[in-house]
């Protein structure tokens, strides 16, 4: 039974990975580097390569960050798979970890194939732009938010029971 549940959570990660890679393939096929394509009043498609990490942190490195973040992403993925195996009774946590796993693998694949992560979603208000991101980044953020929400629910549940 445990392996069937694990397969379900791994399927979520694979779906995230496929959606991420298909969206990046579309961006690479249809967008020109650095030229915004308006989609909505607050959103552009904007093809960029990010050799760093979130918010382009360490993007100016000499190239070491490609393999460092690749190894880090693979190590995190192995740990997440182990966590999925051990935590199957907590469905919210497993869904969150599956989203993070799919996103991490999507960005690792980019680093291996392109030497950088492919970003293409540009949210903005007037002249202020949020750093460009992708589906993998979104899945990682949603997964992290679900983990925080789950922990807060547990914490407040325990607090309410003790009063």
UniProtKB/Swiss-Prot annotation:
EC number assigned by the record: 3.4.23.36
Keyword NADP included in the entry's annotation: no
Main location: membrane
HAMAP family tied to this protein: LspA (MF_00161)
Membrane-related topology note: Multi-pass membrane protein
Keywords from the named record: Aspartyl protease, Cell inner membrane, Cell membrane, Hydrolase, Membrane, Protease, Transmembrane, Transmembrane helix
The keyword Transmembrane is assigned to this record: yes
This protein's GO CC annotations: plasma membrane
Pathway info: Protein modification; lipoprotein biosynthesis (signal peptide cleavage)
EC class name: hydrolase
Substrates-to-products reaction catalysed: Release of signal peptides from bacterial membrane prolipoproteins. Hydrolyzes -Xaa-Yaa-Zaa-|-(S,diacylglyceryl)Cys-, in which Xaa is hydrophobic (preferably Leu), and Yaa (Ala or Ser) and Zaa (Gly or Ala) have small, neutral side chains
Cellular localization per UniProt: Cell inner membrane
Protein name: Lipoprotein signal peptidase
Organism: Polynucleobacter necessarius subsp. necessarius (strain STIR1)
Highest taxon in the source lineage: Bacteria
């Amino acid at each position: 039974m445990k392996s069937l549940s694990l397969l379900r959570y791994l399927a979520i990660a694979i779906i995230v990975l496929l959606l991420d890679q298909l969206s990046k393939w579309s961006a690479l096929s249809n967008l020109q580097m650095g030229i915004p394509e308006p989609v909505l009043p607050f959103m552009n498609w904007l093809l960029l390569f990010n050799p760093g990490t979130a918010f382009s942190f360490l993007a100016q490195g000499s190239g070491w960050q490609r393999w460092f973040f690749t190894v880090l992403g693979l190590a995190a993925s192995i740990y997440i798979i182990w966590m999925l195996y051990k935590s199957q009774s907590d469905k919210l946590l497993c869904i969150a970890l599956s989203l993070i796993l799919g996103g991490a693998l999507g960005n690792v694949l980019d680093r291996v194939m392109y030497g950088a992560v492919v970003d293409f979603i540009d949210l903005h208000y007037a002249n202020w732009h949020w750093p460009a991101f992708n589906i993998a980044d979104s899945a990682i953020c949603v997964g992290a938010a679900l983990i925080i929400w789950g922990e807060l629910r547990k914490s407040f549940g325990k607090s309410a029971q003790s009063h």
